Design a protein with these regions (language model features):
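Short alpha-helical segment of the dimerization/phosphotransfer core of two-component systems
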Residues: 47-52
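Conserved micro-motifs of the catalytic ATP-binding
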Residues: 66-70, 100, 104-107
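Conserved polar catalytic motif of the HATPase_c/GHKL fold
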Residues: 117-118, 122-123
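Short beta-strand/loop element within the Bergerat-fold HATPase_c
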Residues: 133-143
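Short conserved segment of the HATPase_c
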Residues: 156-168
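Short alpha-helical Gxxx[C/S/T] motif in the catalytic ATP-binding
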Residues: 161, 181, 185
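Detector for a conserved hydrophobic position within an alpha-helical segment of the HATPase_c
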Residues: 189-190
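Glycine-rich ATP-binding loops of the HATPase_c
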Residues: 193-199
Length: 214
């Protein structure tokens, strides 16, 4: 799967870059001659190309989760969250809050960053309240770290509680979702002999729980 994903990625990204460049040139050269509908269609073309690019990147990441060697070091989860908040899209009405102090764990820095980034990116775009909140917390047991990520978003129907961890399964904001993020999360947690589950109420929000073995 990994080798196939890399080949497909290379073959698909080249024409995508060409389409993106052509759309940009058309917009720059003819925006004064196009009507509002024409300009809108070119912008939509760019957005669809960007969405396809994200999908390809997601497939690549999914294909490499199990093949990469885990380089376990001391990982400060507080620092990971801080770094993620600096790079992901967070709507103005949403805040990400850390409840207490998160631990320093023995894990692969890249994988833990990938894990939380997928969780948080998924959470912030599915909040429909005027004031959106995402809360991150952690509890310690003798063998595991148990993390929770709670949001006051749209909620997830019961019938999707298992499906969303499978590749290409998504609900809610389909424009921003590739259907890969939570499947990557599941594979990373599996590598740390952990479990993942959720509690959700439609219109109230969702809390994801997951464990990572010490």
């Amino acid at each position: 799967l990994q080798e196939y994903a890399h080949i497909v990625s290379h073959d698909l990204k080249s024409p995508l870059r060409s389409v993106s460049a052509l759309a940009t040139w058309l917009y720059d050269d003819y925006k004064d001659k196009l009507d509002e509908n024409g300009r809108y269609n070119l912008q939509m073309m760019q957005e669809k190309v960007e969405g396809m690019d994200k999908l390809i990147e997601g497939i690549l990441k999914y294909s490499t989760v199990n093949s990469d060697t885990l380089d376990n070091t001391d990982v400060d989860v507080n620092e990971v969250i801080h770094n993620i908040k600096e790079i992901i899209f967070i709507p103005e009405h949403v805040s990400i809050q850390v409840m207490g102090t998160l631990p320093i764990i023995q894990a692969d820095q890249t994988k833990i960053h990938q894990l939380f980034q997928n969780f948080l990116s998924n959470a912030v775009v599915n909040i429909d309240k005027e004031v959106g909140v995402v809360e991150i917390a952690c509890e310690e047991s003798s063998k595991y770290w148990q993390f929770s990520i709670k949001d006051n978003g749209v909620g997830i129907p019961k019938e999707y509680h298992e499906k969303i961890f499978k590749i290409f399964q998504s609900i809610g904001n389909k424009e921003r979702s590739t259907g890969i993020g939570l499947s990557i999360v599941k594979k990373i947690i599996d590598r740390y002999e952990g479990k993942i589950w959720l509690e959700s109420e439609i219109g109230v929000g969702t809390t994801f729980f997951f464990t990572i073995k010490k």
